[in-house]
Amino acid sequence: MTTTLRRGETGSLWDRFCDWITSTNNRIYVGWFGVLMIPTLLAATICFVIAFIAAPPVDIDGIREPVSGSLLYGNNIITGAVVPTSNAIGLHFYPIWEALDEWLYNGGPYELIVFHFLIGIFCWLGRQWELSYRLGMRPWICVAYSAPVAAATSVFLIYPIGQGSFSDGMPLGITGTFNFMLVFQAEHNILMHPFHQLGVAGVFGGSLFCAMHGSLVTSSLVRETTETESQNYGYKFGQEQETYSIVAAHGYFGRLIWQYASFNNSRSLHFFLAAWPVVCIWFTALGISTMAFNLNGFNFNQSILDSQGRVVNTWADILNRANLGMEVMHERNAHNFPLDLAAGEVLPIALQSPAING
């Protein structure tokens, strides 16, 4: 006689679904934020791929002069982009059912991609916090991830809101991003904004600190292998002993620069490595969000004059000329002519005609 013991089914279908969603034993953690993250990121990705390949030209300026951005309409991987929603739409919510005939022409895919993408990365951030909570970890992973989330939100949502149209959002492409950067510099002088300068310090400084830390650790590994073996074999996942000598790294760096320029605490060191770029990128996102409402970077529009009233050219004048040139090239239509050019005083080019002696 054979007796079979079967584990009884406990709980309702909903309870089992909840247990599966929040289980940390799954190969990929889903979580409640993942329930919303997965469909939104899938929708954004699918729409982006289709639009990048086959979307028809978009009337970005709202004046019936469409601009093509897809591969099938003459672009390549470098020049291709998902063109932002038309200026004729402004800040209106523009779902596909609002204008089936003109949705593609007015750049509807851009709004669809951006909105779903932003919701998706917000949920990814929440999912990071949720998984950390389930595992009993501290929440600093999602705090660090909030920096790129804030940066993406500032260029895709806050800046268009401040400028009054989603046509001013960053195009979804390589050269589209470069064009956005040039126009941003022309209209807001972002290079002269302290918060952007902090962001540059965060990105380049973070790269420098990462390279310094990695090279110091790699150079001070505790020898566990012979010369003929890879040094990576000297580490076993989960081992208790240190794999490198922080004392040696501290001594080297302290003698190379200055004693107090080197960390002697591994925890404070890694906190600094995380905090430096995160805080600086926070400030950059804040700077873009303020420039969205035209609180721009420093300007040096008043040239230095000598005793005769003549301009003494400085680097600020060169920067101003570059900004005005980029702004004129960007605004392709007379009715959008830059106000800082159209409203300025007329400056004489020459006080008198030169004499021509034949």
Swiss-Prot record:
Where does this protein hold chlorophyll a PD1? Answer: H196
Site, as annotated: Stabilizes free radical intermediate: H188
Q: Principal localization?
A: membrane
An example of a GO molecular function for this protein is: electron transporter, transferring electrons within the cyclic electron transport pathway of photosynthesis activity
| Residue span(s) of the pro-peptide | 343-358
Function, as annotated: Photosystem II (PSII) is a light-driven water:plastoquinone oxidoreductase that uses light energy to abstract electrons from H(2)O, generating O(2) and a proton gradient subsequently used for ATP formation. It consists of a core antenna complex that captures photons, and an electron transfer chain that converts photonic excitation into a charge separation. The D1/D2 (PsbA/PsbD) reaction center heterodimer binds P680, the primary electron donor of PSII as well as several subsequent electron acceptors.
Q: What is the official name of this protein in its record?
A: Photosystem II protein D1
Task: Provide the species name.
Answer: Mastigocladus laminosus
Its lineage opens with: Bacteria, Bacillati, Cyanobacteriota, Cyanophyceae, Nostocales
Gene it is expressed from: psbA
